[in-house]
Amino acid sequence: ECSAIATNRLGSSFDIQGGGSDLKFPHHEFSAAHAEAALGVKRMAQSYVHTGMIGLDGTKMSKSLGNLVFVHKLVEAGVDPSAIRLGVFAGHYRADRDWSDDVLRTAQERLQRWREALSHPGTVEEVKEVIQHLRLALADDLDTPRAIAVLDEWAKKAPESGEATEEASDLLRTAVNSLLGVRL
């Protein structure tokens, strides 16, 4: 049914199909075989992107165990969506990883440090260099842990720069929001 839904919505061939690593085999391979045989196309999806599984405190999250963490419930509880995003981005998208109160706390602290560092971001040229390194990390298989490390390093050095221009702050704020979806 997945190949029927995908090809109905996206056509007989499309660029990217994604899902959890647990769907790689046999699910995605069977779906592709069905669609390719039925529609006579060489490849249903040109690329497949499979994410790692996220566990909770060392246990696989599942409906049957009742241990799911819902983003909307975290937001309803007052958690900043940008902190949630940073917590998820702390691990590479293909790697299995764990969600915990510690992961969230670390992400919240990181977000606060980045926001504080915006008051003295460095020169426009320095900020442009940070953004370039951020882009390079994301261009390398969406390496969000490396992207976060780039911004952590910037935030650590920011107080030393003493430079505070609204242009530099706005430039970095816009880049981080655009590239990571994190609001500073």
State what each model feature region is:
Residues 1-122:
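Alpha-helical recognition segments enriched in aromatics with Gly/Pro capping
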Residues 38, 42, 81, 91-184:
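Feature 926 captures the class I aminoacyl-tRNA synthetase adenylation module centered on the KMSKS loop
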